[in-house]
Regions:
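Phosphate/diphosphate ligand-binding glycine-rich loop within oxidoreductases
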Residues: 90-208
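Active-site capping/gating segments
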Residues: 203-204, 301, 316-340
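Rossmann-like adenosine-cofactor binding region
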Residues: 248-319, 323
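Acidic, proline-/serine-/threonine-rich low-complexity intrinsically disordered repeat tracts
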Residues: 38, 42-47, 53-91
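NAD(P)-binding Rossmann-fold cofactor-contacting core
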Residues: 234-250
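N-terminal signal-anchor transmembrane alpha helix of single-pass membrane proteins
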Residues: 2-24
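Short helix-loop-beta connector
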Residues: 209-214, 290-291
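Glycine-rich adenosine-cofactor-binding loop
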Residues: 101, 195-198, 205, 213-232
Length: 341
């Protein structure tokens, strides 16, 4: 009886081995090992153990874009160049103002006006326009249709007049213009000329000039004419002094001790001594100056010119043109800011 019993056990053992091998070779069959997995559902198994191909798919490196392949006869197409950005100002202002003349490196008007515009919250900007020729003023106005006005400095204070529509009465009398108002009317442009140099001179130097009776005006340019107009208004006798002398204009060689003693006011209306040539000064006999003399310089840069310095060394009172520049600028803005005319 033992032998048949052993045969039966052997058959059962072989069947079990076969079943185990079948389970190992077929992992999708979930009937094997269900007792050791407890009550875990198929859904929970899938959540805890994602498929192997999904795991590898999620961890694969991203595919690189294939680079173009070119044969020897095929050249790569050039990348299109970006269109250049248009050159535009950082801000478009409602109104433009400026200064015309040549040279303009010495001028401080742009800094002063733009500070004024910022402080007063005025939508405007002031630029320097250095013109090679006064004829370029027409191109300037065409280029900037929002140009509302401009100042004029050397050497164009008299040359600008033929380009103006009209002059105000004072500018007509002086024969020089330092302020122009630009009006746009009925599709056209009107240029009206004014002179605020004489206003600036009067307000800046008027108090110092009290008690003086005779003045020498060095130079015969546009600002010289404005100074003469102001001195005439004050009742101060005056004479021009120039290298080009004639019956009415004295020469520098005529400045004798007696002449220097007679004229106790000397006004420098030349650009001599203006920045950057700060070591230069008009050729007058400074040794004849004394404490009774008053030297006035319309130059605003530098604050103290060599003309002023030499005058002070001989006891004279001296004042520069910085305040005069500010006063004439205030008068110019009042003209530009008026509505109509």
């Amino acid at each position: 009886m033992v032998f048949p019993f052993l045969v039966v056990l052997t058959i059962i053992f072989l069947a079990l081995v076969k079943n185990v091998n079948s389970k190992l070779n077929n992992p999708d069959d979930t009937s094997f090992g269900s007792e050791t997995s407890g009550s875990q559902s198929e859904e929970n198994k899938d959540d805890d153990f994602p498929p192997v191909d999904e795991v590898f798919q999620n961890n694969k490196e991203p595919e690189r874009e294939s680079e173009p392949v070119f044969t020897q006869t095929q050249e790569p197409e050039p990348e299109p160049k970006p269109e250049p950005e248009p050159v535009v100002p950082l801000k478009t202002y409602d109104s433009l103002y400026g200064l015309i003349g040549k040279p303009l490196a010495h001028s401080t008007s742009m800094v002063r006006f733009n500070k004024f515009f910022r402080d007063q919250h005025i939508d405007a900007h002031y630029n320097n326009y250095e013109l090679e020729s006064i004829e370029d003023v027409t191109k300037l106005i065409e280029k900037y249709p929002n140009l509302r006005g401009f100042n004029v400095t050397i050497p164009y204070k008299q040359d600008i007049i033929p380009y103006l529509t009209r002059l105000d009465e004072t500018a007509q009398s002086i024969g020089a213009v330092n302020t122009v108002k630009v009006l746009h009317r009925d599709g056209g442009v009107e240029l009206i000329g004014y002179n605020t140099d004489w206003t600036g001179f009067t307000k800046s130097f008027g108090e110092l000039l009290e008690g003086h009776s005779k003045a020498l005006i060095l130079g015969t340019g546009g600002v010289s004419k404005a100074v003469k107009y102001a001195l005439d208004k004050m009742g101060i006798e005056n004479r021009f002094v120039s290298r080009n002398s004639n019956f009415e204009i004295m020469g520098y060689y005529e400045l004798s001790p007696s002449v220097m003693d007679e004229f106790d006011v000397i006004v420098n209306c030349t650009p001599i001594g203006m920045w950057p040539d700060v070591n230069q000064c008009p050729d007058i006999p400074y040794g004849f100056l004394s404490e009774k003399h008053l030297l006035l310089d319309v130059i605003a840069n530098p604050d103290e010119t060599m003309f002023m310095k030499k005058g002070r060394e001989h006891g004279a009172t001296a004042k520069g043109g910085k305040d005069m520049l500010e006063q004439q600028a205030v008068a110019a803005w009042e003209i530009w800011d008026r509505i109509g005319e």
